[in-house]
Amino acid sequence: MHGLLLAAGLLSLPLHVLAHPQPSTSTSLAGRAGAVDLNEFRVAHRSSYTSHDEMKKLPSIASFRQGTYLEVATELVKQTMPNMEFRLVDDHYVGDSGIGHVRFRQTMHGIDIDNSDFNVNVGKDGKILSHGNSFYTGPAPASNPMVKRDFIDPMQALNGVRKALNLPVKANGAHVENMSEHKVMFKGTSGALSDPTAKLCYMAKEDGSLALTWRVETDIGDNWLLSYMDAKESSKVHNVVDYVAHATFQVYKWGLADPTEGKRDILTNPWNLKTSPLTWLADGKTNFTATRGNNAIAQYNPDGGNDYENNYRPSPKNLKFEYPYSPDMNPPKTYIDASVTQLFYTSNVCHDLYYMLGFNEKAGNFQVNNRGQGGKGNDYVILNAQDGSGTNNANFATPPDGQPGRMRAYIWTRANPPRDASFEAGTIIHEYTHGLSNRLCGGPANSRCLNALESGGMGEGWGDFYATAVRLKPNDTRKTNYVKGGWVNNSPKGVRMYPYSTDMNVNPLVYTSNNKLNEVHAIGTVWCTMLYEVLWNLIDKHGKNDGPVPVFENGVPNDGKYLAMKLVMDGMAIQPCNPNFVQARDAILDADMNLTKGANKCEIWKGFAKRGLGVGAKFDPKNRTGSNQVPNECK
């Protein structure tokens, strides 16, 4: 679950329930008494990434036989990891940039190694563009654990997780139902929003060994956890992943970051029929008269509960979603219709824009009805306005494709009267982008690939980057600075360490700043700062389209702003599971190589190098090495 800040009690593992309060050094469970710090259970960085430039140095790749992108990808894994057992993950697709994305999961004795993945990117020419790899290469277990059933039963695992993490789940009288050979469901529990499950799997550990675990899944609202309990010791949790990282419409239209930037307008049929052909108010089976449709369902959620379908949502006559609102109105519930409408509008525009840039059905986007275009449906975004489960934050939960995303927008109490997160577009875009990055990085079927500290930080940085790119104004230049979350937080400094700026005197952050940072929002500020440099380099080269949608020429946005947004998005799908900054940088360069044949290589390199992520920069979680160097051809 990801939130805007670092709400007291959230962690930014793969879900996305983080928001944007001032950075905190603590990320614990839901802020409850006795809460456990989930940072202690983060997944370690294990991925390698072989970029396009590195691939060209491997002559053996050129001898690959021609075939489908699946066959080419499978052959690469077989040659790279001979004699290893793996399976094809059923979420492969060809993106709108022509790249075939194929992912494999390593297995041992027929059991998944849950954090051992191999992703292959096949270019439009049928050749390998790049690949990422986190396969386990240590000693294999001597015997198949399924033969002697040499592990604790799943109920012991659930109880062990409950105790170790102090979860509000009760299992007295609960029983186990088999779902498959390695997976069970717990029936009769209380305290979770859905029945917990457990799956037997291995986890590759930092010390190079392999642990047999029960992956216990518990959705408790503000945290949606995958807890890897040792299958032989019911008191030992190895890792934890959190999925939550916390008509006419009268709205602040797209591009206005908050109520200080303009007035509300009445917009007629604001949807884009190319990306939402069913409109925002239908799902192909039902035409709705409330804030519900194929992409999202928005409602008032004052008690913070999970029964969203029966909650109140505006349903006006003649589809006129026109309601009074002023930032001076109080209490917030007096303008709930306007709040739900604004949240519904902003999230749907996000859906439509991201669809145009490549986040479509095959890529794992959020829709009930995918209209036969690939991917898994039945997963609109659940949008809870004025959610009563918290304050001063917002969050987004991103389970795998086919399960609904969930956004919670809270009331912020740092102003008088309080301010509603639904009206700060930057907050909503940031949260929706958690859904984007979690579905693309690792593939639609795996929402566990932004769990390490640096990759989790990039998840926050991408949210800020897209929110900032969207709010750019016609007269902005590279000298324009922007803060994040200034309005909701009632602070001119916003909720980040520094404004986003290309001026080193205003924002001095560089790659090695991460050596002193241990919180995802702080690390995300470094990442977004780098992307802001790249953004302006591309705008200075290609100009800036100030319209609400990109204009494409041969599949490439013809301006720098949308080109940057496109390349960053393509990079998310190319990079390995749990990437670091260096790997994510290389993935963006490879995205440009695929899309434009590397026409923007130097603009990208110079943006990263200015902030210490140049040629020669190296990742070490405790001692990163910075570099301001660019390739010789860019000097």
From Swiss-Prot:
Keyword list (alphabetical) reads: Glycoprotein, Hydrolase, Metal-binding, Metalloprotease, Protease, Secreted, Signal, Virulence, Zinc, Zymogen
Q: Does the keyword Protease apply?
A: yes
Gene3D superfamilies with a match to the protein in the record = 3.10.170.10, Neutral Protease Domain 2 (1.10.390.10)
Q: Which residues form the active site?
A: E431
GO cellular-component terms in the record? extracellular region
**Propeptide residues, chain positions:** 20-246
Name recorded for this polypeptide = Extracellular metalloproteinase 1
Organism expressing this protein natively? Trichophyton tonsurans
